[in-house]
Amino acid sequence: MDGLIFIVPMRNLQALEFLKHLNSIVKKQYPGILLIAQEDGLWPQLTDSVENDHLGFDYKWSGGWTKDLLSYLEAEPLDRRNYYDQLTLSMMYAYSEHYVLTLGKRDVGTLKEFLEKLPGSSRQKDAQLRAAYGYLMLHPGVKMTAPDGDVGPEMRAYLHDLNELYRNHPALYAMDGNSDGFEWIQFTSYDENVVAFLRKTEKQEETILAVCNFSPVSYDSYRVGVPFAGKYKEIFNSDSEKFGGQGVVNARAKAAVHMECDNREFSLKLKLPAYGVAVFGCTPEKGEVKKSSVKKGNVKKTAGKSRGKRMDKAKMTVVEKSVAVKDAVKVVKRVASRRKGASGDE
């Protein structure tokens, strides 16, 4: 679509009007149809309505998200800390459009080709494949997956249960277009290669805690900050033996303790599998005062007291938060430079 919109060095205004008119007509004739744009020119607000003088697409294909995730996963585990920003960059623009996220054949090749790109043994490759699809389903945005016919029984069971997890928990989709539906817990754990975040609805008891470990190191007692006192029960784990994993799971519910971590008043210790994704349902303690999902206003930046290079940026969600803009620009430039270098090598 880039060539249609742009005529260097000017915008193709006639093409823009054509797309607006075309999308309006299609929507009137076929109300249930989905219009998805694939565009790499950073054209703004593709998914805003024609009534607001924009193009009126329903979704935009997030090729950048797929490319960044693959670049991160293809790196050797010991080198992934240098690519960690590519794992988290997407949340800096996640709410600028309505995005479709995909790990389909056209993006990553067949499952066999995808596995060949990943480092490690056969078992480690399988674990990373599960972690990649887990991160896809937990990340904000509409999902589109189309694995090829080479899917084995364990991976088929995994994808089935992952889809059931998504369908049965509104926090994973109800507020996809609202930044209040997402909150970082850990996103500066460069050395550990772990990300942790919350998916939320307006109901506190529907909160989901997701912890993703993209390193080959498993943990028996990994501490993570949590939003409130209460019980945290594991509802999904990519390392379940059912899926061909090692069985590093959290069989019992965890009670949050009053110990600061990740700039949260409460925290808990959990088992975290290597190359694994663990998902927890949250039950607030009785009498727990319901707090705002995301505090409004500026978020102070202070030096973190917890592991690695964590900083007090855990409450940041999108680039709309003014305190994040400078950091976001630095990350975008670094990742863009890395993408350009990778393209030059091809």
Model regions: which residues?
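Accessible peptide chain termini
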Residues: 1-2, 285
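Conserved alpha/beta catalytic core and glycan-binding cleft of carbohydrate-active enzymes
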Residues: 2-145, 167-224, 228-239, 246-247
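Carbohydrate-interacting/catalytic domains
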Residues: 126, 137-340, 344-346
